[in-house]
Every structure is written in structure tokens, then in C-alpha cells.
Amino acid sequence: MGKLDKKQLIESLKEMTIVEIDEIIKAVEEAFGVTATPIVAAGAAGATQEAASEVSVKVTGYADNAKLAVLKLYREITGVGLMEAKTAVEKLPCVVKQDIKPEEAEELKKRFVEVGATVEVK
């Protein structure tokens, strides 16, 4: 038997019943040691991975004696003025940075926790 190209293979499959195609799929899985998985499952896994690649950091609270330190750190990271930083820190929760890599988010969280803030990474 000669080698089939894609077009010939598809034409052959069009002439088969669903049962025959299912038998071919099982034979291919067995011959190559693979499993046919739905495309939807692969797409969903990719979407989950993509969603986790960008996160946001929010300050959700701070200790009574940590307000000034949180305010200074917020200004340092965001580059906003004193009044903007004060307003943001007093109206919690406030987003510090968004759409950043998880590694950067964890570093920011660590810095805020060190000065007495409660932080959420999503």
C-alpha cells in the first residue's frame, strides 16, 4: 500500500462510519501510546495558565502604627504624589500594581507585609 497524503486520508475518512473511525482512533492510540483528548480541555488549561501569568496586588489593610510606612512604600512603587497616595491608602482596598508577573507580585507583597500591611494577590 502506498503512502496516503492528508487529502486522500480525509476522503477515506469521509466514506467511513463513526464506528469505523472510532476503531481507527483506538488503533492509533494503541500504536503510538497516546490518548486522544478533547481540544476544549487543552484550551481551558491554556486559559488558566494565561490568567495566572498576570496578577494584581492590593493593600487590604495595615496595622495602626504602619500607615506612614505603607504610604511611603505605596508612593515609592506607584510614583504618585503624596495626596494621591494618602487618599489611596486611606480608602482600602487599593490596587498597588496590576497586570504584573506573579514573581513581581510576591516581591511587592513581601515588601508591604514587612512594613505592616495586609496584601492580596489575585
UniProtKB/Swiss-Prot annotation:
Species whose genome carries this gene: Mycoplasma genitalium (strain ATCC 33530 / DSM 19775 / NCTC 10195 / G37) (Mycoplasmoides genitalium)
Family: Belongs to the bacterial ribosomal protein bL12 family.
Binding partners and assembly: Homodimer. Part of the ribosomal stalk of the 50S ribosomal subunit. Forms a multimeric L10(L12)X complex, where L10 forms an elongated spine to which 2 to 4 L12 dimers bind in a sequential fashion. Binds GTP-bound translation factors.
Superkingdom in the source lineage: Bacteria
Single GO molecular function: mRNA binding
InterPro entries the record matches: Ribosomal_bL12 (IPR000206), Ribosomal_bL12_C (IPR013823), Ribosomal_bL12_C/ClpS-like (IPR014719), Ribosomal_bL12_oligo (IPR008932), Ribosomal_bL12_oligo_N_sf (IPR036235)
Name the UniProt record assigns to this protein: Large ribosomal subunit protein bL12
Keyword NAD appears in the UniProt entry: no
GO cellular component: cytosolic large ribosomal subunit
One Pfam family this sequence matches: Ribosomal_L12_N
Keywords on record: Ribonucleoprotein, Ribosomal protein
Disulfide bond sites: none
Gene3D superfamilies tied to this protein: 3.30.1390.10, Single helix bin
Stored NCBIfam families: L12
Any one GO biological process: translation
Biological function: Forms part of the ribosomal stalk which helps the ribosome interact with GTP-bound translation factors. Is thus essential for accurate translation.
